[in-house]
Amino acid sequence: MEGRIIMSEYKFETKQLHVGQENPDPATDARAVPIYATTSYVFKNSAHAAARFGLADAGNIYGRLTNSTQDVFEKRIASLEGGVAALALASGAAAITYTLQSLAQNGGHIVAQKTIYGGSYNLLAHTLPNFGITSTFVNIHDLNEVKTAIQDNTRAIYMETLGNPNSDIPDIDALAELAHKHGLPLVVDNTFGTPYLIRPIEHGADIVVHSATKFIGGHGTTLGGVIVDSGKFDWEASGNYPAISSPNPSYHGVSFTKAVGPAAFVTYVRAILLRDTGATISPFAAFLLLQGVETLSLRLERHAENTKKVVEFLKNHPQVEKVNHPSLPEHPDNTLYQKYFPNGGGSIFTFEIKGGQEEAHKFIDNLKIFSLLANVADAKSLVIHPATTTHSQLTEEELADQGIKPNTIRLSIGTEHIDDIIADLQNGFKVIKEG
C-alpha cells in the first residue's frame, strides 16, 4: 500500500477526497484529516526557526499563518481549481478584501462587474475608497465599456462567474484577454460556479476567490474563504505590483516573486496581510469545509438537477412575471451558459412574482421547506427578498442597475426531493391567489 500517489492523474471526484492527504496522517495513521488544534509549532533548532521566518524553508511558523488542517484544505482547493497554491481565510469577505487590497494598494483602481454580491459591491463602492482604492462599476458584458473604464492606475478587473443575484454570466475568455492586453490580472469570484462546474483559470483567470461558506462547505455550518493563485501572472512585467515583486522591508528585503516564484501572490497575502491583520481560519472550520469538499460533485449534480426542474416550473407558472436563469433560451447569457456550464448550474437565481414587494413578502413568508436567510448554496433550499435584505444598502438607482426589483425573489435550490420543493413553492403561490 506504499508508494507516491500522483493526484494530477486522477479525476475531480477522486481529488476532492484525497488531495492534501494522499496517505494516512503520519503521526497517527488516521485516515480522516485530523484537527490540529494548536497555536504554534516547535522548531528543531535556532537555524530551523530562522529559516522558517525568512521564508527559506516552507512550513508552519505560527497558527495565524498556517495550520496543518488548513494546509490540506488549501492544497485540495488549489488542485480542484487548477492553481499552484491557495490561502484559506476566515470568510469569503476576507478573501475578496485581501485580494483587492493587495492588488490596488496605494491609490490603485479596480474595474468591477456591477452585478455582483451586495457585500462585494459595498466593499468596492464605500469601504475600499477609505483606504485609497477606487472602483468603476461596468456592464461586464460590454467589453468596450470595460476597456474604457481602465485607467493608468487600474490594477485588476473583478468579476463573478455567476452574478449575484440574477446569475448573469460574463465571458471569462474575452475578459482575460482584455485584462492581459493591459497588463492586468483578472480576479474571478467562483463561489456560485464552484470548480466542479467551471474552472476560471482554464479560461485565463489569474486569481480565483471563493466564499467557502457556500457550496464548498455546503451545509450552512461554517464561515470560510479561499484565494487561489493561478501562478501564471507576471508580477514583475508591468512594474505596477512592487509589493509582490520588489524587496519587502518587513522580510529583510525578500522579493516574493524571487523567493517563491509562481505562488508569489498568495504567499504575499499570507505573509503580509494575514500576518498583520489576522483573518485566520480556525482548524475546526477548515476541517468542516473539508467534509463539504468531499461531496462537492455529488451535491452540485443534485443542485443542478433540481434547479432545472424548478426553473421549468416557475417559467410556466401564471403568477410568475419573469424567471432570470441563464439556462433559458430567452436569457441574454444563454450562449455563454452553454459554453461555460455544459453540466448545468446556477442553482442561485431570481424570479419576479406578479405584483410587488407585498406579494413577494407574502410568498416568502408562507414557504415551509425554504428557509428565509441570507446564506445561499446550502444543501437546504433557501429564499430571500434581495431589495430589502442582501442588497438593501443600494440606492434605488443602483438596484435598478443591477436588475433587482421590488417583486424580485432570490432562490437557492437545495438537495431535497424535487416534488417537495415544487409543492412548497406552489403553496406560496396558492396563499397569494387566495388573498
Features from the language model and the residues they span:
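Conserved PLP-enzyme active-site core in the AAT-like
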Residues: 8, 16, 20, 24, ...
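Conserved N-terminal alpha-helix of the aminotransferase class I/II PLP-enzyme fold
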Residues: 45-97, 119-126
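Conserved C-terminal alpha-helix-loop-beta "cap" of PLP-dependent enzymes
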Residues: 300, 308, 315, 319-409, ...
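Short amphipathic alpha-helical segments
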Residues: 58, 84, 285, 289, ...
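PLP-dependent enzyme catalytic core of the Aspartate aminotransferase-like
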Residues: 4-6, 84, 125, 134, ...
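Active-site beta-loop-alpha junctions enriched in small/polar residues
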Residues: 162, 191-193, 328, 354, ...
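Short, acidic Gly/Pro/Ser/Thr-rich loop/turn segments
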Residues: 24, 42-46, 234-235, 296, ...
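N-terminal "arm"/small-domain region of PLP-dependent enzymes with the aminotransferase-like
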Residues: 2, 8-67, 75-76
